[in-house]
C-alpha cells in the first residue's frame, strides 16, 4: 500500500499484520509495496518522506531487506529554496546511523529481489545508495549488480 508511512506502520502493528506479512514473505510469498509499502519492507520507517501524523508503537518495520528504502527520491535542487535537499537529509541519517545503508529510488522505479539477487527495474534507470563508509553517494543503473545491498 501507499499513503502515510507512520499511519501504515501503526495499523500494521495494531492488527498484527506487520509480523504476519513478514513471516509470509520470508516463507516465499511475493511482497510488493510502493511508496509507504516500500518503506515498510526495510528495517525501519526512518527514511520515509512522510509527516509523523500518528505515532506507531515503534519505528520497526518488516526488515525484508537489510537496508533502508527512500522512495520518491529526487536530487532536484532549486537554488531559490535555501533549505535542505533530500541528499542532505539522507546523509544526516547515515551519519547518526553509521551501520545504515539507504537505497534511494526514483519515481517509476522499483527494486526486485528474486532468487537471492537484487536489481533495479523501471525508468528512470538510476538509483542512489547512501552509506556511511562512502565519501560520496553512488549511483547505480539497471544493469548494475545490487547484491552488495543484501549483505
Which residue stretches match the model-derived regions?
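Hydrophobic alpha-helical segments and helix pairs
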Residues: 1-2, 7, 20
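Catalytic nucleophile loop
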Residues: 1-2, 24-44
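Short, structured patches in soluble enzyme cores that scaffold and shape functional sites
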Residues: 2, 10, 25, 66-73
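Glycine-rich nucleotide phosphate-binding loop and flanking beta-alpha elements
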Residues: 5-6, 38-40, 75, 109
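Glycine/threonine-rich flexible loop motifs
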Residues: 5-15, 79-80
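Glycine/Thr-rich phosphate-binding loops of Rossmann-like dinucleotide-binding domains
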Residues: 8-9, 42, 49
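A short, gly/pro- and small-residue-rich
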Residues: 13-27
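C-terminal and late-domain segments of enzyme folds
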Residues: 45-47, 51-151
Amino acid at each position: 500500500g501507499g499513503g502515510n508511512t507512520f499511519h501504515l506502520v501503526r495499523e500494521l502493528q495494531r492488527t498484527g499484520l506487520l509480523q504476519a506479512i513478514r513471516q509470509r514473505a520470508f516463507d516465499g510469498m511475493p511482497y510488493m509495496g510502493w511508496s509507504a509499502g516500500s518503506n515498510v519492507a526495510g528495517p525501519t520507517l526512518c527514511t520515509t518522506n512522510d509527516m509523523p501524523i500518528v505515532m506507531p508503537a515503534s519505528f520497526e518495520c518488516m526488515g525484508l531487506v537489510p537496508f533502508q528504502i527512500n522512495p520518491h527520491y529526487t536530487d532536484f535542487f532549486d537554488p531559490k529554496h535555501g533549505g535542505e535537499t533530500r541528499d542532505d537529509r539522507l546523509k544526516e541519517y547515515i551519519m547518526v546511523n553509521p551501520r545504515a545503508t539507504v537505497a534511494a529510488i526514483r519515481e517509476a522505479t522499483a527494486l526486485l529481489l528474486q532468487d537471492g539477487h537484487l536489481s533495479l527495474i523501471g525508468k528512470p534507470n538510476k538509483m542512489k545508495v547512501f552509506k556511511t563508509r562512502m565519501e560520496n553517494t553512488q549511483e547505480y543503473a539497471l544493469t548494475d549488480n545490487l547484491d552488495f545491498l543484501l549483505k
